[in-house]
UniProtKB/Swiss-Prot annotation:
Protein name: Integrator complex subunit 8
Gene: ints8
Described function: Component of the integrator complex, a multiprotein complex that terminates RNA polymerase II (Pol II) transcription in the promoter-proximal region of genes.
Stretches for region Disordered: 1-22
Keywords: Chromosome, Nucleus, Repeat, TPR repeat
Predominant location category: nucleus
InterPro entries with a match to the protein in the record: Int8, TPR-like_helical_dom_sf
A GO-annotated cellular component: INTAC complex
Subcellular location: Nucleus; Chromosome
Annotated motif WFEF motif, positions: 24-29
Length: 991
């Protein structure tokens, strides 16, 4: 074979290949294959697809010798395929929620009909004619399951369904879709004709106060082996999956309630039946829970049904507390409109009425008002005002309806509006954000109302004065002053204030207000063009103090000669950065793209600035949306291009480089950081320098060259954690050392370093940084217990100026970093061990033991396998022993002494001598496998006269697997089994 061919073959063999999908006919050839396939966590094909394949193959028509289509033959192959489909459904516990979600109506109809046949229900028999009390349990369950599905399908067909948009299809595919649609409609037609029968059957099933059983894979196998065996082993057996009477009642009542509710519009008495069934379901849910392996009750939908039934069919028997919905419904029927208003006002404290319901009540009141009931006009405004305040508190814009009703404001309207605002903030839980929203609404109201008396009503109100900031109050006062200067002081009152045309200053103010609120680039441009057309000497980028552009950019932007272009660039960039800061990335992209398009025409420098900001935005967007998937090559290339950029005189924001470095580290693009970044950027940007050193260290791990690169990183971090020292003379004349923690000797402050690290997610990078800080922490002079970490040996063992290091800050940093790392991956045994060591070093023994046990659990499948020796080293075991000892759990101490490579008999015997143990004591003896310790326990209990405990110890010694003459393999197996059980019991105790 040539070298080229060998390379090609090696490359092909190294590619990961997806295992082939199991074909349906393979299950016919191997009886045991189906069960093995279903046990897989992500079986391919999935169970529901197998059902479709099996039934599709079993129902395929055949062709005779004359090429005529014949119905499928009843042969062994087809019977086996149908049985396989039933077994898959049995594996899914006959859960209709699962089956309905994945199977079409025709397929599920075929499946349940096969279940009826398998349960010996004669084809063509009317289920309503069957006496369920005399039938075997599995037959009853099959009949019940079919009729539950029938009425559920009827109910589901009553809901509106959004049509699925389909692209162009092949003619044969279109035919199949049309055939399936027609078949579904035919089945639905039959089900609806038999709906009353299905309801009667289910009502009868609810009268059977006994447990039910449904077929499992095992009972179906027995039926296939021996056709005479109808229901498992015997006719009246309880073989199969048990469904309790309460579970059956819960399912049946819920499904019957749904179908009765569907029939309510044509038969109002059905609402009462639905109410009774839903309330019974609610009682059963509180008793047995809303979910099981074979069913699930949607509690939110159930609550909605109960509320609707409480309104449509109020119960005189069951004393249910009147809900706001039912109260409003009754008030609407009796025309008690003040009662409706009272509920709306009270709801501002508890927010129980959703927005859709509020709007529907308002629409109904509007409709009645338009039909001639003029007295409702005032009520419509009041309800609309309540809804408007609710919308404002929930971040929604003010509706057009409110503006229409408030077009001619009056004293009464203002009084009511202020009352609603006050009520909405009466709760102790009213947040500062809610207060700010109401304050902004009232401020805007003052700026919009033309009648000065009404404006003074609002501005002089206690709520207004208490919530507005000084700056906002000044703005309103200035607005009133300007408005007052324009008002004619004649004694004759103006008949219609709305007939006065708006002045130019009013128009400018309105446009500036719109400019502040809008985030549409095109609209911003149009407003600025209008404003500059009115007056060209204003600097409109100063309209809002909230518009902030980084100082490094402002010089280039404010240097633009054309005033309109300057204002537009500044505002677009400021709004784009603001949207990015509040994580509204789509709008930020729209604004920055418009700004990029604008500056491309006249300024290469600003074009590069905008490209950099677009890159930063794309990184933020990617991290927020799909951070788990590898980024597209185009984004990686742009990040590399930014760090490799050598264009002079381009203002660079440090945060862009920081995010780019974090991005490359997270995706292991170490080559770019170590080889391709220009030296000038490394020297000028501390994050680039730190990222380069980190990348170089991670790249060399765990090789011998890692020590060299690690030394450079070590020196940089030590400098960051070092502070300048100052000497101060005390009153007694002695000189003491003062550490100035407000200054640093490094390339950045410690809090900046921690903030940067919290942008990293790559495990190796985090492990490297953790080991560095752990090593630095271990160098402090007063340390008692070292913390362990991976790769700790690559760091230097001493620091020239030890006194300059702020070890308190280092300790805080270690705790911060390990807590952050565990949010990234809570299953890293090395990080869990570091957390445990930290708790151990601070004498928090219970927490330390918890994390030591977690570290073992995550790498042993919760102690079902042996914990790797590199995780539970002798040092870790000794620390666990110390934790148990300090918690007075002395029996646990003795058992853990066996885990050491050399059993520590001295510590074990000393622990067992303690009589104030706070653990299970003799209940732990089954976990001891060392005969010497058990013999000592026997002697100890005999000496103390503790006969019962002595017998337990003797029983533990007498187990045959602990016999000293057994082979080493048997003894090792016995020890491992006891280790696993003991650690599992410890985990249950401390987790």
């Amino acid at each position: 074979m040539s070298a080229e061919a060998a390379d090609r073959e090696a490359a092909t063999s190294s590619r990961p290949c997806t295992p082939p999908q199991t074909s349906w006919f393979e299950f016919l050839l191997d009886d045991s294959l189906l069960e093995k396939h279903l046990q897989k966590p992500h079986s391919d094909p999935p169970p529901v697809q197998l059902i479709v394949q099996f039934l599709e193959q079993a129902s395929k028509p055949t062709l005779n010798e004359q090429n005529q289509v014949q119905p499928p033959t009843d042969n062994k192959r087809n019977r086996t395929l149908k049985l396989l489909a039933l077994k898959v459904a049995a594996h899914l516990k006959w859960n209709l929620d699962v089956l309905e979600k994945s199977l079409s109506v025709p397929v599920l109809n075929m499946l349940l009909n096969e279940l009826l046949c398998a349960s010996k229900v004669p084809p063509g028999t009317k289920h309503v004619d069957l006496d369920l009390s005399t039938l075997p349990p599995t037959t009853v369950m099959a009949v019940t399951l079919y009729n539950r599905w029938a009425i559920r399908t009827i109910v589901q067909s009553g809901f509106p369904v959004k049509p699925v948009k389909q692209g162009p299809q092949q003619p044969n595919v279109m035919n199949q879709i049309q055939q399936e649609k027609e078949l579904t409609e035919n089945i639905l037609k039959v089900l609806k004709e038999q709906a009353e029968d299905s309801i009667t059957v289910l009502e009868g099933a609810l009268q059977l106060k006994r447990d039910f059983y449904v077929h499992t894979m095992r009972t179906l196998d027995l039926l296939a082996v021996e056709p005479g065996m109808v229901n498992g082993e015997t006719e009246n057996s309880t073989a199969g999956f048990k469904i309790s009477s309460d579970e059956m009642q819960c399912q049946g009542c819920y499904d019957l309630g749904a179908v009765y509710f569907l029939q309510g519009p044509t038969n109002p008495s059905c609402y009462e039946k639905a109410r009774d069934h839903f309330f019974r379901t609610k009682q059963l849910v509180s008793k047995i829970g809303a979910a099981s392996d074979h069913y699930a009750i949607d509690e939110k939908r159930l609550a909605g049904y109960c509320q609707a039934c409480g309104v449509l069919a109020p119960s005189n028997v069951v004393s249910q507390p009147a809900t706001p919905y039912s109260q409003i419904h009754n008030f609407m029927k009796t025309n008690n409109y003040q009662g409706i208003l009272k509920i709306f006002l009270e709801d501002h404290l508890n927010n129980s009425l959703p927005d859709q319901f509020r709007q529907s009540v308002l629409r109904e009141l509007f409709q009645k008002s338009q039909q001639g009931n003029g007295a409702l006009a005032e009520l419509c405004f009041k309800v609309c005002a309540c809804n408007t305040v609710y919308d404002i508190l929930h971040g929604q814009p003010v509706t057009v309806q409110f503006h229409q009703l408030f077009m001619k404001p009056s004293k009464e309207k203002i009084d009511f509006l202020l009352e609603v605002c006050s009520r909405s903030l009466m709760s102790d839980q009213a947040s500062e954000a809610s207060k700010r929203k109401i304050a902004t609404f009232l401020k805007n109201l003052c700026l919009e109302i033309e009648d000065l008396q009404l404006v003074f009503m609002i501005s002089s109100h206690e709520l207004f004065m208490k919530m507005l900031t000084d700056e906002e109050s000044k703005m309103v006062v200035e607005h009133l002053r300007k408005k007052t200067s324009r008002v004619s002081m004649c004694t004759k009152p103006i008949t219609s204030f709305y007939d006065i045309p708006a002045s130019a200053s009013v128009n400018i103010g309105q446009l500036e207000h719109q400019l502040i609120l809008t985030v549409d680039p095109w609209r911003i441009r149009q407003i600025l063009i209008e404003l500059h057309g009115m007056t060209s000497d204003r600097q409109y980028w100063k309209v809002s103090s909230k518009w902030e552009v980084p100082t490094i950019y402002s010089g280039s932007i404010l240097g633009i000669k054309d005033n309109l272009t300057r204002d537009l660039v500044y505002i677009l960039l400021a709004k784009g950065l603001h949207c990015s800061a509040i994580k509204d990335y789509p709008r930020a992209k729209q604004l920055l793209s418009a700004c990029l398009e604008l500056v491309t025409e006249f300024s290469p420098k600003l074009r590069q600035v905008m490209l950099n900001e677009m890159l930063l935005l794309d990184i933020y967007t990617y991290e927020a949306v799909s951070a788990q998937e590898r980024p597209p090559p185009e984004l990686i290339s742009r990040v590399r291009g930014y760090l490799e950029m050598r264009i002079p005189d381009i203002p660079l924001r440090q945060v862009v480089a920081e995010e780019c470095v974090a991005f490359l580290l997270n995706w292991r693009e170490n080559e770019c950081l170590t080889l391709q970044v220009p030296a000038s950027l490394v020297q000028s940007n501390p994050y680039v320098k730190l990222g380069q050193l980190l990348a170089a260290t991670c790249k060399e791990l765990p090789g011998p060259d890692s020590r060299r690169t690690a030394k450079d990183l070590w020196e940089v971090v030590v400098q960051i954690c070092s502070v300048s020292n100052q000497h101060k003379r005390n009153n007694d004349g002695r000189v003491c050392l003062i550490k100035n923690r407000d200054s640093t000797m490094g390339i950045m402050y410690r809090n900046e370093l921690v903030s940067f690290i919290k942008k990293l997610r790559e495990p190796l990078v985090l492990t490297t940084l953790l080991s560095l800080f752990v090593k630095l922490h271990n160098l402090r002079e007063d340390i008692v217990n070292d913390i362990t970490a991976e790769h700790i040996s690559i760091w230097p063992s001493c620091i020239p100026n030890l006194q300059a290091v702020d070890f308190d800050a280092v300790a805080v940093t270690v705790k911060e970093l390990v807590s952050y790392a565990l949010t990234i991956n809570s299953n890293s045994h090395s990080w869990l061990t570091i957390q445990a060591d930290i708790y151990f070093a601070t004498n928090e023994y219970s927490a330390a033991l918890n994390y030591y046990l977690q570290a073992g659990a995550v790498c042993s499948d919760f102690f079902t396998k042996q914990v790797p020796p590199e995780v539970y080293t002798d040092q870790v075991i000794k620390r666990m022993i110390k934790c148990c000892s300090m918690l007075n759990c002395h029996t646990q101490v003795a058992i853990l002494c066996q885990f050491l490579r050399e059993i520590d008999y001295k510590t074990a015997f000393k622990a067992l001598q303690e009589q104030n143990s706070h653990d299970g004591m003799d209940s732990y003896y089954d976990y001891i496998w060392d005969v010497t310790i058990l013999e000592y326990l026997t002697y100890l209990h005999h000496k103390r006269g503790e006969t019962d405990k002595r017998q337990i110890a003797i029983k533990a010694i007498g187990q045959t697997e602990l016999n000293a003459s057994n082979p080493d393999e048997v003894l090792q197996l016995a020890a491992q089994r006891r280790k696993k059980k003991f650690l599992q019991s410890m985990a249950k105790l401390y987790f």
